[in-house]
Amino acid sequence: MRPLTPRQAEILELIKRNIADTGMPPTRAEIARRLGFKSANAAEEHLKALAKKGCIEIMPGTSRGIKLTQESTEEPDLGLPLIGQVAAGEPILAQEHVEQHYKVDPAMFRPSADFLLRVRGDSMKNIGILEGDLLAVHKIEQARNGQIVVARVEDDVTVKRFEKKGNKVFLHAENEDYSPIEVDLANQSLSIEGLAVGVIRNGDWQ
């Protein structure tokens, strides 16, 4: 299979994950919404590029007419990607953010993990999330109050406990030395990148 751009790799992974989770591929509109494209036409152009590279087949006449090729489904299992520094404005699972892969079974966690994030700082130490740990994260777009989430506030990515009150979101640390991060949704950008589903002690992987 010909090399993919970071965006193409991200779309291919989204298609695979959608088929695994729901039994069917996403629509163009769903791809556009989940990856922040302005229109379904932008998703269509990326799908055509994936088809040219032999990753998928496009089936005309249906909104879910995407079929994985045998070549794309036989890629070796590299394990869970470890996400390093996240560039401003870029999707968290973009290829350039992946430091390495760990041979971890995603099914160890409930719900299953989609990626690992290295913990920086001690703001969540009171619940056992420590500096240098690997946080297992399940990709979601919406969170419920009380959940531990990976959130992007403007261009900063943080791990905190989620609480929404009206048009404001509070991201709470689990360390009394840190004040909550208050986000006014009327004039600040907030996106949920994932749900924390487990912790791997850093020393376990040395």
From Swiss-Prot:
Site feature location: Cleavage: 88-89
GO biological process assignments: DNA repair; DNA replication; negative regulation of DNA-templated transcription; proteolysis; SOS response
EC numbers for this chain: 3.4.21.88
One Pfam family per UniProt: LexA_DNA_bind
Catalytic activity: Hydrolysis of Ala-|-Gly bond in repressor LexA
Classification via Gene3D superfamilies: Umud Fragment, subunit A (2.10.109.10), Winged helix-like DNA-binding domain superfamily/Winged helix DNA-binding domain (1.10.10.10)
Disulfide bridge positions per record: none
Active site, UniProt feature: 123, 160
GO molecular function: DNA binding; serine-type endopeptidase activity
Protein origin, superkingdom: Bacteria
Keywords associated with the record: Autocatalytic cleavage, DNA damage, DNA repair, DNA replication, DNA-binding, Hydrolase, Repressor, SOS response, Transcription, Transcription regulation
DNA-binding region(s), chain positions: 28-48
Quaternary structure (record): Homodimer.
Family note: Belongs to the peptidase S24 family.
Family matches, as NCBIfam families: lexA
Functional note: Represses a number of genes involved in the response to DNA damage (SOS response), including recA and lexA. In the presence of single-stranded DNA, RecA interacts with LexA causing an autocatalytic cleavage which disrupts the DNA-binding part of LexA, leading to derepression of the SOS regulon and eventually DNA repair.
Record protein name field: LexA repressor
